[in-house]
Amino acid sequence: MKTLAYLILCLAPLAMAGGQTDGPAPGKVTLVYFWAEWCAPCKMVTPALQEMASSDADIALRKIDLTNATEESYGVKALPTVKVYNRGGSLVGTVVGADVGKVKSYVAQAKSGG
């Protein structure tokens, strides 16, 4: 629960400013995806993440565009970064880079209660 509160506090300014996210979706496995327009690996991974979320009602995708922000302000060191949260809002894992297989592995772990 501590992780969920931290994430909400970090993302609250985005939500208040009409940003792309409102934090983890209650009762769903949530992918918080940090990306930027200029990021070539992001362009490769975006369609796969969108497909995962659109084909599975248990998965919510929250995209955070860092095109005009710094990665450090969100604790992100490189793009793309995907943070996978379980249904309870606890962080299951973080994937740095365009490794969709690793994201799917964390999603499976999150669905099984991890």
Regions found by a protein language model. Give the residues of each.
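Bacterial N-terminal signal peptides
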Residues: A5-L14
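Structural micro-motif
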Residues: Y74-K83
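Sec-exported extracytoplasmic/periplasmic mature domains
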Residues: M44, Q50, S54-D58, R87-S90, ...
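Thiol-based oxidoreductase modules, predominantly thioredoxin-like and allied folds used
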Residues: Y33-F34, T46, Q50, D56-A69
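Local sequence-structure signature of Cys/Sec-based thiol-disulfide redox active-site neighborhoods
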Residues: T21-M52
